[in-house]
């Protein structure tokens, strides 16, 4: 399968989406599409036999006006469309004002008629109902061609009918017999309907313009994110000179120079120089970071002072910035469950509105009303219905939220990320690399009697050098002289073994090596390390327990505040780790986590998540390592630290770009605020149509008022979604448990399960039995 994206510029609401696709040639039926009415982008999955060019040409023949350009270039179409509508709106409004005044005057005071007044009104109205209203007529014609209908069909029909009726009443000298005087004008029973046709055009164009402008604002976050990339790079030549090239021509392993005020052109490794780098464009963190040789840097960040020589490791579409843009776009293109329901309703909405309009006309005729009242009520029904509000209720909120999340360092992969947060009551944290910095260091080496500490450390470091586990890397980095290792084997969740200088060496957990340790020295060293919250690693050489290596990992400064913020919001927290219970309990006590689940094998983390879910909890998991991948996938909501492994990032629903736990409560707040916005939009969209159509059918609304109400409805939905752009403006999660947590304007997420704090739920989980499952390679 191959995936392409097309810009559907001729689509305005959910009703438009199925029309073209349902009428494409049968030979192109071997593809599936996902069309988003807010972004107007169709994601098409093609089979191998289907040619991309065939699909594009078929869609163009269906008059869907495709554009296969870059996705970010397509975002500019919203701004261009807003300018296009503004021109038509300005001309229509300039003609509508005198037209409305003259029409009311001629209707209320027939004595003001003068020779040629009919032609004056016609001259003012025709440009409005034809040229200015052409965007509606064009889509309506397309829909009629393919036996479909949309909001534009309703508007075009209303404008056309009002224009034809106006020509008949003006040139046929039709006189109304109802509602004489000024009340006739207010109640919409005038014999002149030019101002109605023009007024509908003006109000709907105004709504379309403001909606298009708001939608272009909704994409600003994504455009700003893409604009962070550097335009050029100063590549270092072998002779020491520099050559400036476009950043998109930079290749991996090329070295480039970055000076103060310049943007780093690609992800890479600092080879030479020191500088302070602003990470805020990518991670949202305001505090600059000091980088030195050997540090990794991210493309799109800005050097504040100092000079760096960077070796490119990821360029072009492989950079972290490009990946962020792709994730945000993918999130914006997906349709939530609520939106799929709205789309199904919208697909039958327009035919139902036509039926209601026809029944309204028949009903008023049976009641003995005159043609003016019949016509006014039917037109009001047509123009007041707003399927557009239904189509925009969810995708606009998700589009704004995903863009705002990217600015805050939160990448949401799709609508599941939003929907899963509604019932989350428990947040489970991994320890190493998540709650702690992951930068482990050897803090102490204790040798058994008859052994030397240097010898123990060197033998252990030699074996650990073949593993990529965080503890192994720390031990391996503690010494530079290492012998070759043979027969290396990693036992996930336990440790490693190998042969060094013909001596069998095992390094790993006390439970694996020293289940029965008779050395008082080693037992004391282990106890002291665990009381300090450090990890104790035993070393065995030729079957003899010869030493204990204590590895320390600093707790992140943001961990305690983040956990306190979660507690203030009503969430329960748990620590899930393969470390020993004493060390895990020390870390949990320092941070304030409710529950500790320690000494867990990597494959058993999934079982722990399942146990929590079986007890009625809705679980969010935060992790960063390879062995966290299955648990992140099993949890109701998986959050991966951005600097984590590809496995963790791939399994998670949300990626936290910042290496800062303050973003965890912010993420849950953003998702909850987004779901509240979507719910409010849906209530408004359904409520408006349910209430407005009967009022219009009852003849209580002038068609002008109906057109204005319809335009306002869709504009209201988009504007309400745009409120999410300000999310986090007054949010401060960097709070201690002794300070009041400032939240966004909306209330915090509520606990949906009262059993969360019951005595049964508060009891710790027993470590689950080992079971066969996912075995992460060389990790414990």
From Swiss-Prot:
GO cellular component: plasma membrane
EC assignment: 7.2.2.8
Domain of life the protein comes from: Bacteria
Transmembrane stretches, start-end: 89-109, 114-134, 153-173, 185-205, 348-368, 374-394, 680-698, 704-722
Annotated InterPro entries: ATPase_P-typ_cyto_dom_N, ATPase_P-typ_P_site, ATPase_P-typ_TM_dom_sf, ATPase_P-typ_transduc_dom_A_sf, Cation-trans_P-type_ATPase_A/B, HAD-like_sf, HAD_sf, Heavy-metal-associated_CS
One biological process term in Gene Ontology: copper ion homeostasis
Binding-site list for Cu(+): 13, 16
Keyword tags: ATP-binding, Cell membrane, Copper, Copper transport, Ion transport, Membrane, Metal-binding, Nucleotide-binding, Phosphoprotein, Translocase, Transmembrane, Transmembrane helix, Transport
Subcellular location: Cell membrane
Keyword tRNA-binding: no
Membrane topology qualifier: Multi-pass membrane protein
GO MF entry, a single one: copper ion binding
Active site: 430
Residue ranges of domain HMA in the record: 2-67
Main location group: membrane
Catalysed reactions listed for this entry: Cu(+)(in) + ATP + H2O = Cu(+)(out) + ADP + phosphate + H(+)
PANTHER family: ATP7, ISOFORM B (PTHR43520), P-TYPE CU(+) TRANSPORTER (PTHR43520:SF8)
Described function: Involved in copper export.
Family: Belongs to the cation transport ATPase (P-type) (TC 3.A.3) family. Type IB subfamily.
Protein's name in the database: Copper-exporting P-type ATPase
């Amino acid at each position: 399968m191959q995936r392409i994206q097309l810009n559907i510029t001729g689509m305005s609401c959910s009703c438009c989406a199925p029309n073209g696709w349902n009428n494409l040639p049968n030979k192109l039926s071997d593809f599936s599409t996902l069309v988003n009415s807010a972004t107007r982008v169709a994601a098409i999955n093609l089979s191998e036999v289907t040619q991309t060019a065939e699909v594009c040409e078929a869609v163009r023949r269906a008059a869907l006006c495709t554009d296969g350009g870059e996705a970010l270039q397509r975002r500019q179409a919203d701004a261009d469309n807003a300018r296009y509508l503004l021109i038509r709106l300005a001309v229509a409004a300039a003609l509508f004002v005198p037209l409305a005044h003259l029409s009311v005057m001629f209707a209320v005071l027939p004595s003001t008629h003068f020779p040629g007044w009919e032609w004056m009104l016609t001259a003012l109205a025709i440009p409005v109902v034809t040229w200015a209203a052409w965007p509606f007529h064009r889509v309506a014609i397309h829909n009629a061609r393919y036996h479909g209908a949309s909001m534009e069909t309703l508007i075009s029909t209303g404008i056309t009918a009002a224009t034809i009726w106006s020509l008949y009443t003006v040139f046929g000298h039709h006189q109304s017999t109802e509602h004489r005087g000024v009340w006739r004008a207010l109640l919409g029973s005038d014999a002149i309907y030019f101002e109605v046709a023009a007024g509908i055009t003006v109000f709907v164009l105004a709504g379309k313009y403001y909606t298009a402008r708001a939608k272009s604002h909704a994409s600003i976050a994504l455009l700003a994110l893409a604009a962070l990339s550097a335009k050029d790079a100063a590549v270092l030549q072998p002779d020491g000179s520099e050559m400036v090239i476009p950043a998109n021509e930079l290749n991996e392993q090329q070295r480039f120079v970055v000076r103060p005020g310049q943007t780093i052109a690609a992800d890479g490794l600092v080879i030479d120089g020191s500088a302070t780098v602003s990470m805020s464009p990518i991670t949202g963190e305001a505090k600059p970071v000091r980088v030195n040789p050997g540090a990794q840097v991210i493309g799109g960040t800005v050097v504040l002072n100092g000079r760096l020589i960077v070796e490119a490791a990821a360029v072009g579409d492989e950079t972290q910035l490009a990946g962020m843009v792709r994730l945000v776009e993918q999130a914006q293109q997906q349709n939530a469950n609520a939106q799929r329901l709205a789309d199904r309703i919208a697909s039958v909405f327009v035919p139902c509105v036509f039926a209601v309009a026809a029944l309204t006309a028949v009903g008023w005729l049976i009641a003995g009303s005159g043609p003016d009242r019949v016509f006014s009520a039917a037109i009001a029904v047509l123009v007041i219905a707003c399927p557009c509000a239904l189509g925009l209720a969810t995708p606009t909120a998700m589009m704004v939220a995903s863009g705002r999340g990217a600015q805050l360092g939160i990448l949401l992969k799709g609508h599941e990320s939003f929907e899963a947060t509604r019932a989350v009551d428990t947040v489970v944290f991994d320890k190493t690399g998540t709650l702690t910095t992951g930068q482990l260091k050897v803090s102490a080496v204790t040798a058994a009697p008859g052994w030397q500490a240097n010898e123990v450390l060197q033998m252990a470091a030699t074996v650990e050098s073949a593993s990529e586990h965080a503890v192994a890397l720390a031990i391996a980095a503690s010494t530079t002289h290492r012998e070759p290792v043979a027969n290396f084997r990693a036992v996930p969740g336990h440790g490693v073994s190998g042969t060094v200088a013909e001596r069998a060496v095992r390094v790993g957990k006390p439970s694996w090596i020293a289940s029965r340790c008779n050395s008082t020295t080693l037992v004391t060293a282990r106890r002291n390390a665990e009381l300090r919250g450090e990890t104790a690693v035993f070393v065995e050489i030729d079957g003899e327990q010869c030493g204990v290596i204590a590895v320390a990992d600093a707790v992140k400064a943001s961990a305690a505040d983040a956990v306190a913020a979660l507690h203030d919001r009503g969430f329960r927290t748990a620590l899930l780790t393969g470390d020993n219970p004493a060390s895990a309990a020390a870390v949990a006590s320092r941070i304030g986590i409710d529950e500790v689940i320690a000494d867990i094998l990597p494959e058993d983390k999934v079982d722990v998540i399942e146990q929590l879910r079986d007890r009625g909890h809705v679980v969010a998991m935060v992790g960063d390592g390879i062995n966290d991948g299955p648990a992140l996938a099993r949890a109701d909501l998986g959050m991966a630290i951005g600097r984590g492994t590809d496995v963790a990032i791939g399994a998670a629903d949300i990626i936290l770009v910042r290496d800062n736990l303050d973003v965890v409560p912010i993420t849950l707040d953003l998702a909850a605020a987004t779901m509240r916005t979507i719910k409010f939009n849906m209530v408004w969209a359904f409520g408006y149509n349910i209430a407005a159509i009967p009022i219009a059918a009852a003849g209580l609304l002038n068609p002008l008022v109906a057109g204005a109400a319809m335009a306002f409805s869709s504009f209201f939905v988009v504007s309400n979604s745009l409120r999410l752009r300000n999310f986090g403006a007054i949010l401060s999660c960097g709070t201690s448990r002794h300070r009041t947590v400032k939240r966004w304007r909306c209330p915090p997420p509520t606990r949906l399960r009262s059993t969360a704090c019951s005595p049964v739920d508060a009891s710790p989980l027993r470590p689950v039995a080992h079971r066969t499952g996912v075995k992460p390679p060389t990790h414990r």
